[in-house]
């Protein structure tokens, strides 16, 4: 079983293959920036963290913006993709502190956090629940994650925004060699030297009549050893993803959006992911196909004698 230790505001995980830290206060959700270490190659994540949670949105066509919390668009950061906030604030920067539970199984440890949004815009009410479960197994260079939303509103197209696998900070491409988008292919780091809007290049928007075979997004980390593994996030059911960005705005922005479908008060939506290091695209595809179609994770038992299963 991986080792787990709570130290102040952080949960430290160490397995035979990786190390990771979860921050429960400050900049929260997902795995902390720079803490996900691949013990085989020495690679670390290069961004603001992995599986980082934001807020709830909806398409804005034909709807007025909330004057007190307008969604900005028409710039390099957001392009001309019109959205409107439904519930706020942004979890990663504004929640400040997340309740958590730690679970221990025979060959894994898991951490579950949650947050209830306290603010809503215009016609909506606050109270939607976000739950995130991170499962860290022994013997693998990846972990399994799930985000689940329980809506407090009726909405024609409710969207949950997150970073998947996570934004990529770099200095003129020195830290990474390539981006990989399964629905597009490999893209050299040289394409990300100057800022461009999300709707200029590499924008994914779901077409239910032509879903991609896999939804894998990530980057190849340059290492001193030259082994250069891929760090990717795999959303295991492509139908769960409504939109995904991959653009440069001072860093490579890996925004991903889930849902985008009609939902009623009390209903749930979300996705499940594999996030980790791989030596090749073939290796990614092999693991993806092992778990293909999964959309959630559930914990069973108590915190000392736990099993987990796909939801």
Where are the language model's segments positioned?
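Beta-strand-rich recognition/accessory modules
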Residues: 2-14, 198-311
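Short, solvent-exposed loop/turn segments at secondary-structure junctions
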Residues: 18-20, 27-28, 118, 150, ...
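Broad, structure-driven detector of short, well-ordered beta-strand segments within folded domains
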Residues: 17-25, 126-136, 229-235
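Short solvent-exposed loop/turn micro-motifs enriched in small/polar/acidic residues
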Residues: 3-6, 93-95, 127-129
């Amino acid at each position: 079983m991986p080792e787990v230790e709570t130290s102040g505001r952080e949960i430290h995980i160490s397995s035979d293959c990786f190390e990771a830290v979860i921050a429960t206060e400050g900049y929260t959700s997902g795995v902390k920036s720079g803490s996900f270490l691949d013990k085989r190659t020495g690679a670390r994540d290069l961004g603001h963290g992995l599986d980082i949670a934001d807020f709830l949105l909806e398409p804005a066509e034909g709807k007025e913006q909330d004057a007190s919390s307008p969604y900005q668009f028409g710039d390099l950061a957001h392009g001309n993709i019109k959205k409107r906030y439904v519930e706020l604030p942004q979890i990663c920067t504004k929640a400040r502190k997340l309740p958590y539970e730690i679970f221990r199984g025979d060959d894994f440890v898991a951490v579950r956090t949650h947050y209830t949004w306290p603010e809503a815009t215009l016609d909506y009410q606050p109270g939607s629940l976000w739950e995130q479960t991170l499962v860290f197994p022994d013997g693998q260079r990846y972990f399994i994650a799930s985000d689940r939303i329980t809506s407090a509103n009726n909405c024609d197209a409710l969207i949950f925004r997150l970073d998947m696998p996570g934004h990529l900070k770099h200095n003129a491409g020195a830290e990474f060699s390539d981006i990989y988008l399964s629905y597009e292919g490999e893209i050299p780091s040289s394409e990300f030297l100057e800022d461009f809007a999300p709707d200029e290049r590499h924008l994914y928007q779901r077409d239910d009549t032509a879903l991609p075979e896999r939804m894998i997004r990530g980057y190849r980390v340059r290492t001193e050893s030259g082994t250069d593994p891929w760090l990717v996030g795999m959303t295991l059911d492509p139908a769960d993803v409504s939109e995904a960005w991959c653009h440069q705005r001072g860093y490579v922005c890996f925004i991903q959006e889930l849902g985008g479908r009609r939902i009623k008060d009390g209903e749930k939506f979300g996705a499940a992911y594999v996030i980790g290091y791989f030596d090749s695209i073939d290796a990614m595809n092999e693991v993806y196909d092992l778990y293909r179609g999964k959309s959630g994770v559930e914990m069973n038992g108590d915190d000392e004698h736990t099993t987990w299963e796909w939801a």
